[in-house]
Amino acid sequence: MAVDPEVLGDVLGRLRPEVPGIEVDRWAPSVQGAVGQVVGVRDGNGSPYVLKVYPATARRRLDTEVLAQRLLGEVPGIAAPRPVGYGQRNGPAAVGFLLMTRLDGVRWADRRADLDPARTTALTREVGRTLRQLHRVSGQQFGDLLDDGPRRPTAWEHVAARTGELTARYLRTGGPSRLAERIRHFVEDHRRVVAACPGPVLCHNDFVDSNLLVPATGEPRLCGVVDLERASWNDPLSDLAQTRLHVRYHRPADTTALTEGYGVDGPGEHQRLDVHEVLHALAERNWIAYDRPAGWRESVAALDAFLADRT
């Protein structure tokens, strides 16, 4: 749904003292996000920006994205939007808003069909290297990026809590109890390798082709990372596992290029990566069973089969 024109006009008015001459331009994303609505704008000098408008209920998503952009701005070699201005519009049509710099490029997802296998594999390897670079920002505890959010002191406590929440939801959405028990045992059996995580880092939590930018034409190289509203402090291999699950859907053979590009080292790290991928697949299965998009039964069956095979 597009941003209400009256709301958009009011938000632009609030930003104009900081960004003189700001107006809507013709740029628009190929696909809108599930939470925030994105609008292209320019200032009086023609400099391009992106305005993201969030529902009032998503204030934490806004604050998380602002903080994550600032943290990522300290990491060399990664192009990400920088926050320019943000705030909250109260009243009957309350929204949050974030004005950020605009990056060049298009979504990898928009070019995927045009890329040959060799280029796709090379890009996947680069994605692994870039994600490793993002993980240079370290935190203190596992959980919410914002200081007032829920956090846990150890990797194992974080994973154990997540496993409990996900398996309970799995049962509520019709998942077989025998498979839920297998998943719990699988995670418990890998407690030692999970606990070996050296510490939490900044995790994107959606480092996939819809949030990674490449040039619109020519050689596909990673030129931008966007959509940081889900960022958190977590095990870096949890972040990589989510990306690997996504790569597996498109080109299963490229999962090796991804993990090699990232630099997964030794059997312990590979096992830890497997645990996190199982949990991500379980979370996705739960969401599909609850939301029921087109073809949901087939998707649920495929994910149940994957979970059974991996545990």
Language model regions located:
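Short beta-strand segments
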Residues: K52-Y54, V84-G85, L146, L202-N205, ...
